[in-house]
A protein has these predicted regions:
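Conserved substrate/cofactor phosphate-moiety recognition/catalytic segment
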Residues: 22-60
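Conserved lysine of the Walker
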Residues: 13
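Hydrophobic anchor at the beta1->P-loop junction of P-loop NTPases
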Residues: 5
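NTP-dependent small-molecule kinase module
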Residues: 134-209
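A glycine- and Lys/Arg-enriched "phosphate-lid" helix/loop adjacent to the NTP-binding pocket
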Residues: 86-159
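P-loop (Walker A) phosphate-binding loop of NTP-binding proteins
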Residues: 8
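Post-Walker A alpha-helix
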Residues: 16-17
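A basic- and aromatic-enriched beta-loop-alpha substructure that forms the phosphate/nucleotide-
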Residues: 61-101
Length: 209
């Protein structure tokens, strides 16, 4: 089974992936950040490195999806291949940071890949406001993220909302501003109840009965 977590930069995808993997005994697949050879250069010069970075992510994510499809384990994935192609690449193109030629090439490659894979069994989308994202980004202190532009985050957020409206697979939406799933066990419990209901048809026990 394939569970995927989606959300803007700083939404808490990696944290929720780790917590749910531990809670359910699922196998986590994390976003390839630490060993990414393009990420630091990209945040220093987005226009120069946007295509290289997006192709790198697309390659890694496609390999992940193929491996997940072959696995007998339940895998929870930190970010999806759809976010790369439906959110990040179009946002860069609209901002003038990816050329028409590169964007067309990238989109053709993604469409070919999508003819070979299926949607996750469940998508968990973390919806977060820009101030909340900025707070998380500053708190985790990755040097290359400190130069992220607010208009870049805002553009991503708008594209996420457009994508979610048209997403065709099973999905739950988590309010990232109101659910502190890292430090508040009750918030994490509420999320797991949503997952149980969607995946297994289970409903939370009513403690008043």
């Amino acid at each position: 089974m394939h569970i995927a977590i989606a959300g803007n930069i700083g939404a808490g995808k990696t944290t929720l992936t780790r917590l749910l993997a531990k809670r359910y005994g699922w196998t986590p697949h994390y976003e390839p950040v630490d060993n990414n050879p393009y990420l630091e250069d990209y945040y220093g010069d987005m226009e120069r490195w946007s295509f290289n970075l997006q192709i790198y992510f697309l390659n890694k994510r496609f390999r992940d999806v193929v491996a997940i499809a072959k696995s007998e384990e339940t895998v929870i994935q930190d970010r999806t291949i759809f976010e790369d192609a439906r959110i990040f690449a179009p946002n860069l193109h609209d901002m003038g940071l990816m050329s028409d030629r590169d964007f067309a090439n990238y989109t053709d490659l993604f469409d070919l890949m999508m003819s070979l894979v299926k949607l996750p069994d469940l998508l968990i989308y973390i919806r977060s406001s820009i101030p909340h994202l900025i707070e998380h980004i500053q708190r985790r202190g990755r040097d290359y993220e400190q130069t992220i532009r607010i208009d870049y985050l805002r553009g991503l957020g708008e594209r996420y909302e457009e994508w979610i409206k048209t997403y065709q697979g099973p999905m739950i939406i988590v309010d990232g501003d109101k659910n502190d799933f890292l430090d508040n066990p009750a918030d994490l419990q509420r999320i797991t109840e949503m997952i149980d209901e969607r995946l297994y048809g289970l409903f939370p026990l009513d403690n008043k009965d």
